[in-house]
Curated annotation (Swiss-Prot):
Main location class: nucleus
Binding site for Zn(2+): 210, 213, 226, 230
Entry GO terms, CC: chromosome; histone acetyltransferase complex; kinetochore; mitochondrion; MLL1 complex; MSL complex; NSL complex; nuclear matrix
Gene Ontology molecular function, alphabetical: acetyltransferase activity; enzyme binding; histone H4K16 acetyltransferase activity; histone H4K5 acetyltransferase activity; histone H4K8 acetyltransferase activity; promoter-specific chromatin binding; protein propionyltransferase activity; protein-lysine-acetyltransferase activity
Zinc finger intervals, C2HC MYST-type: 207-232
Record-given protein name: Histone acetyltransferase KAT8
Variant or mutagenesis effect after changing residue 274 to R: Abolished ability to acetylate proteins
Family: Belongs to the MYST (SAS/MOZ) family.
Species this chain originates from: Mus musculus (Mouse)
Tissue spec: During oocyte development, expressed in both oocytes and granulosa cells.
PTM (free text): Acetylation at Lys-274 facilitates cognate substrate Lys-binding and acetylation. Although considered as an autoacetylation event, acetylation at Lys-274 probably takes place via a non-enzymatic process following acetyl-CoA-binding, which primes KAT8 for cognate protein-lysine acetylation.
Upper classification of the organism: Eukaryota, Metazoa, Chordata, Craniata, Vertebrata
EC number: 2.3.1.48, 2.3.1.-
Length: 458
């Protein structure tokens, strides 16, 4: 097999990054305020011979982000980048999602009095402008939506004790993102999170990946040689969907273990909260690709357990960053529900979902339900909606609550809608029809035989 034989970790818990219209890393990450960000200033030239403070691990410094704003950042780790021949520091921007953590050169840290004074002066001017603005009050619901959209990280104090303990343990294990970039196909992509690539691979600033077999390499020379030798031009497994240039392959983790392990290592670079397993055999992977004359190029995927005791129809879901905001995330979500319909079951993504995953699922659920409510005439229950869509009743209730379309009356949830309210929601860009939809006619798939037997007994 063309992919690597090293034992790798597999993602088994949803932390979906599906990427439909949500901000990318670094966008809208600061709390709402004036258009000009605090701390935006062209770095002044330090006086000749002006001493710099020594950078120490665990200390906090002002750091210039890629958008030229300055923020407090804790230095987590340092390294010598052998590929670039320079010293770098791994920083976490205080109060921001860990997705934005990055390796920076020393010249992006405010280490002299001249630079620190200039940043401080600019920040004070920003705060003065902010104080002159009319006071705005926001509701708890508005704050929740704001925090989801802008990736505001919860503090440990805002979590229950068990969650806080797990978060601290998770953060300690995955604190430093050594692999900073990957090259795959025609794209060079910044990594978002730590991924447990084995041995020396996990400490390289950059990895090269074959987009067909997903073999990962430390050196560009090895990568170029591999491209000339690799015979793969599509994922392994069975093609179960093809429409125009969109294709989906079903890959059994038991039959294609190394490919699926490599896929999970790739996905972990863009997914934070996951439980990692070494065994991919209990999972089936659905690989979404764009097809051209060169081959089938991986766009994203979702995985699901062959047997889910909790009724989950998705374990992990990801759209690779270059393909986000193009409708592929909602396509993957819709595809998972098409499979559930063929299985005559209801399903829900495994929790926890990432912030971006929550936004995409909520947007998809809202659109599906609004489309039904707009065209339906007569009496309709939440159970009816669940049977029609394969969405769980709990997910339907939470979605309708977010749309102010359900009330709790006499011990049960009651749908309360008007045609006008439905149309108003459908006019919103947030709930518009996805640009790419699943054509069930093009889906060539049936549930496994053991599941068909179970369904026939129900």
């Amino acid at each position: 097999m063309a992919a690597q034989g090293a034992t790798a970790a597999v993602a088994a818990t949803t932390s979906g990054t599906v990427g439909e219209g949500e901000p990318g890393p670094g966008e809208n990450a600061a709390v709402e305020g004036p258009a000009r960000s605090p701390g935006r200033v062209s770095p002044p030239t330090p006086a000749r011979g002006e001493p710099e403070v020594t950078v120490e691990i665990g200390e906090t410094y002002l750091c210039r982000r890629p958008d030229s704003t300055w923020h407090s950042a804790e230095v987590i780790q340092s390294r010598v980048n052998d590929q670039e021949g320079r010293e770098e520091f791994y920083v976490h921007y205080v109060g921001f999602n860990r997705r934005l953590d990055e390796w920076v050169d020393k010249n992006r840290l405010a280490l002299t009095k001249t630079v620190k004074d200039a940043v401080q002066k600019n920040s004070e001017k920003y705060l003065s402008e902010l104080a002159e603005q009319p006071e705005r009050k926001i509701t708890r619901n508005q704050k929740r939506k704001h925090d989801e959209i802008n990736h505001v990280q919860k503090t440990y104090a805002e979590m229950d004790p068990t969650t806080a303990a797990l978060e601290k343990e998770h953060e300690a294990i995955t604190k430093v993102k050594y692999v900073d970039k990957i090259h795959i196909g025609n794209y060079e992509i910044d990594a978002w999170y730590f991924s447990p690539f084995p041995e020396d691979y996990g400490k390289q600033p950059k990895l090269w990946l074959c987009e067909y077999c997903l073999k990962y390499m430390k050196f560009e020379k090895s990568y170029r040689f591999h491209l000339g030798q690799c015979q793969w031009r599509q994922p392994p497994g069975k093609e179960i969907y093809r429409k125009s240039n969109i294709s989906v392959y079903e890959v059994d983790g038991k039959d294609h273990k190394i490919y699926c392990q490599n896929l999970c290592l790739l996905a972990k670079l863009f997914l934070d909260h996951k439980t990692l397993y070494f065994d991919v055999e209990p999972f089936v992977f659905y690989i979404l690709t764009e097809v051209d004359r060169q081959g089938a190029h991986i766009v994203g995927y979702f995985s699901k357990e062959k047997e889910s005791p909790d009724g989950n129809n998705v374990a992990c879901i990801l759209t690779l960053p270059p393909y986000q905001r193009r409708g592929y995330g909602k396509f993957l979500i819709a595809f998972s529900y098409e499979l559930s319909k063929l299985e005559s079951t209801v399903g829900s993504p495994e929790k926890p979902l990432s912030d971006l995953g929550k936004l995409s699922y909520r947007s998809y659920w809202s659109w599906v339900l609004l489309e039904i409510l707009r065209d339906f005439r007569g009496t309709l229950s939440i159970k009816d909606l669940s049977q029609m869509t394969s969405i769980t009743q709990n997910d339907i209730i939470s979605t309708l609550q977010s749309l102010n379309m359900v009330k709790y009356w006499k011990g049960q949830h009651v749908i309360c809608v008007t045609p006008k309210l439905v149309e108003e929601h459908l006019k919103s860009a947030q709930y518009k029809k996805p640009p790419i939809t699943v054509d069930s006619v093009c889906l060539k798939w049936a549930p496994p035989k053991h599941k068909q037997v179970k369904l026939s007994k129900k």
